[in-house]
Curated annotation (Swiss-Prot):
Gene that this polypeptide is encoded by: meu29
Cellular compartments per GO CC: fungal-type vacuole; Golgi apparatus; membrane
Record lineage: Eukaryota, Fungi, Dikarya, Ascomycota, Taphrinomycotina
Transmembrane regions listed in the UniProt entry: 134-154
Entry protein name: Meiotic expression up-regulated protein 29
Stretches of the chain found on the membrane's Cytoplasmic side: 155-217
Topology of this chain in the membrane: Single-pass type I membrane protein
Extracellular topological intervals: 22-133
Location of this chain's protein in the cell: Membrane
Carbohydrate-modified residues: 84
Length: 217
């Protein structure tokens, strides 16, 4: 009698366990096919798209397959592909959320799982749909500021070296040139007066009689 009861308990335990695992796991379903929101029959949409390209391009078909069969059925990792994806968009990130993991048929799975994905423009898509985003004011502004700084530094260096004091040039500085000419005239006048003074002193020295001492006396 004990053996019969034990066998019955084991039978019910295995049957209920298998039924529970079959009903609330996704390892029996290898792939999920997501269609557009227009063909949806349940309360919420199956496809949730985020990103700037969703308004112009929406993917009507997505096939997702989990890549670890019969391993951790409640924590499946899904790999999704979009066969009808345009070359102007690319999927950046995606994830699958299943509210009810009833694995009795493919239809029940597709009605209860939701695919969230983010759609971004590729280079060709931006060039076709958003060409103004390829041009930014930041590089031009930075280049303009660097050009102004380089021009200021070059002008300061040229002024320190005295290259901008030459007359009849487009960088002619009248004030600096006048000061330079005044200093040159002053220096030449001083040199002329100094030479005249030396010459006058020499002439006076020649005219003054010098007493001669006679040592024989």
């Amino acid at each position: 009698m004990f053996v019969v009861k034990t066998a019955v308990l084991l039978f019910f335990a295995l049957f209920i366990g298998n039924t529970y695992a079959y009903t609330y796991s996704l390892d029996r379903i290898q792939a999920l096919k997501f269609s557009s929101e227009s063909s949806n029959v349940d309360d919420g949409p199956r496809l949730h798209c985020k990103g700037p390209a969703c308004s112009s391009h929406s993917n009507d078909l997505a096939i997702c397959q989990h890549n670890q069969l019969n391993v951790a059925p409640h924590l499946l990792k899904w790999t999704c592909v979009w066969p009808n994806q345009s070359s102007h968009v690319e999927v950046i990130d995606y994830n699958i959320e299943c509210k009810k993991t009833v694995a009795l048929s493919m239809d029940s799975i597709t009605k209860t799982c939701i695919l969230n994905y983010k759609l971004e423009w590729t280079y060709s898509g931006v060039l076709l749909h958003r060409p103004w985003k390829l041009f930014s004011l930041k590089p031009f502004t930075a280049a303009f500021v660097l050009l102004l700084a380089a021009s200021y530094l070059a002008t300061a260096c040229f002024r320190m070296l005295g290259y901008l004091g030459t007359p009849r040039s487009r960088f002619h500085d009248n004030r600096r040139w006048n000061e330079q000419k005044f200093m040159e005239l002053a220096v030449s006048a001083v040199e002329e007066q100094l030479s005249n003074g030396i010459q006058l002193f020499s002439n006076v020295k020649q005219r003054v009689p010098v007493p001669v001492l006679d040592e024989s006396v």
